[in-house]
Structure formats: structure tokens, C-alpha cells
Amino acid sequence: MNQSILITGANIGIGKEAARQLALKKETKKVILFCRNQSKAEAAKKDLEEKTGKKMFEIIIADVSDANSVRKAVETIKEPIDAIILNAGGVVGKTAGNVTPSGMNVLAATNILGHVILVEELIKRDKLKKAVLLASAEAVPGVKLLGMKPVSMKISSVDEFAAVLDGSYFGDKFEAIEAYGYVKYAATMWMLSMARKYPDIKFVAMSPGNTKGTGAPDNLPPAMKFMLTYFMMPIVFPLIGGMVHTLEVGAKRFVDGVSDERYKSGIFYASKEGKLSGDAVDQSTFYTDLKNTSFQDNADRAIHRFIK
């Protein structure tokens, strides 16, 4: 049972809803909202307290794309944490291809850099006890019906992964939507490598699926945002079936991922092949690169090239 849980990006969307659901579990004693913006975090905390009737929410302010910010935040964590949900991230927006001081582009830094530092620093301090869940995505195995091709790297070498992280893999024209799947692949493979390094801690990668009510469309180009918000999500996806679900359902995947023994360490769970909703299943049954331990370790080594 997880008595204390930290959630990154917990002031909105799936992260906030996961915090609400976790607070209502009888074993939960503390939920830490790990957020970038103080005022938004305070507003989320107030709303969560009102909705749950619980006074168990705490706030830690840090920017997951900034290594030093995360390291400073770790120093403020005095008591062990049972579980962490690495939820912050997404497509990011217009600045996605910009290079950060770490050498990673903004997209990679936001989805990977701070999360790796947070987890590894807490383990080093013996402050992480039971479980880590990473928000991954169906963009990794792809969704044929929507024209989303699976991530396909030549040899998944350290250099290839590093090129994804600094953006050079994509050449002169960096498209965040295309790069997103590759960044999530790198993050997911790091998680699977961690499962082998630390067998006493559960490491699960989990896609929330295609979830309504999140801030995800906000970072898309205007035309795509309009199409997704007003046409695809409310009309097309429900007609197709197995392609969209509510915020509560998406967040429950995360809650179950850290709490339910059905979900095993070292596995990436997401929707069934070709779907974006429904049961969360082991993706390695059809996207077999996930099983390659050399690829997993290559992702880990590539990420650590950018961590000083």
C-alpha cells in the first residue's frame, strides 16, 4: 500500500485527477503536488481539498526541465515517499525544439530530464520505497488508423538516442508531434532499464490513453487544436470506438499502475494495438523492441550524457 505519493504536473488534467483519486483511497496519508507554478499549485491544492474533504496535499515547486531546480526540490524532501507518478510533460509547444542548458531540447528535457534526476536522487538518498510510474504514450507503438507510425530507429544505439534528445536526429525541421513519440520511447526504455537495476522497486510505464479534459491540445498548432477539440474528440473518436475516454478513466490508469499488483515492473502498458482507449496491455507483445535490454541500457546511457 502506498501511503505517500508524489505527482509531477499535478495542478491540472490527469495529474490533478490522479491526485484526487489517490486521496480518496483509505491507505493514502499524503499526496505531494510537484508543480512548476506556485499560484497554480495553490489553486489546485485548494480545489482538491474541497473536492475530497482531505487535508493531505502538500506542494513542492520545481521545473522538471531544469536540472538544478529539481535537485533543489529533492533537498526539501525529508521523509521517504512510497510512490511517484511522473506525469509532467507533453508536446510542449513552439519552444519544443529549443536547446536547454543541459543540451537536451525543451521537449526532451520536459519529459525526461527532471524526472530522471528526481527518481535517481531519491533512490540515492533512500527516499523512494515502492513504485515509480512514467506517463508514456501510444505514440511509441503507433496507431495505424490515425496514420501514427510506430517509433522506428535504425539500431537504437546510444548515439541515436542522444540525437533524439538534442533534436539532431530530426534534421533541420523539428516537428514536436513527430519527435514526441521518440522522446517517450527513450523515457520508456529508461524506465525498463531501471526495473532491472532496482528489482525491489516497481517501475511501470503507462499511457493514460486518449483522454478528454486535459491541457494537451493547448500545445498543438491552432488548426490541429481546433480539429481535435471540436471534431475528433467529441464526434469522430466516440463513433470509431476504443479511441477516447474521460479524464477519470485516464487518471485511473495511473492510480492502478502504482497501486494494483496486476501491473508488473518493467512493462509498458497502453491501449490494445491500434486503439487509444480500453484495457491497458503489455505493449511488448506487438512492439518487440521494448524487450531488448541493450536498447533499454542505450537509452539510459544516452540520457546520462546530458546529466552533469
Question: What is the role of each PLM region?
Answer:
Residues 40-43, 106, 249, 256, ...:
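Residues within well-formed alpha-helices
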Residues 1-214, 308:
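Rossmann-fold NAD(P)H-dependent dehydrogenase/reductase core
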Residues 232-286, 301, 305:
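C-terminal helical subdomain
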Residues 66, 259-260, 283-296:
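Polar helix-capping/helix-linker motif
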Residues 197, 205-220, 267-288:
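C-terminal/domain-terminus segments
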Residues 170-177, 210-212, 216-248:
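Alpha-helical membrane-targeting segments
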Residues 115, 184-187, 247, 296, ...:
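A structural signal for well-ordered alpha-helical scaffolds and beta->alpha junctions
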Residues 290-308:
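Amphipathic terminal alpha-helices
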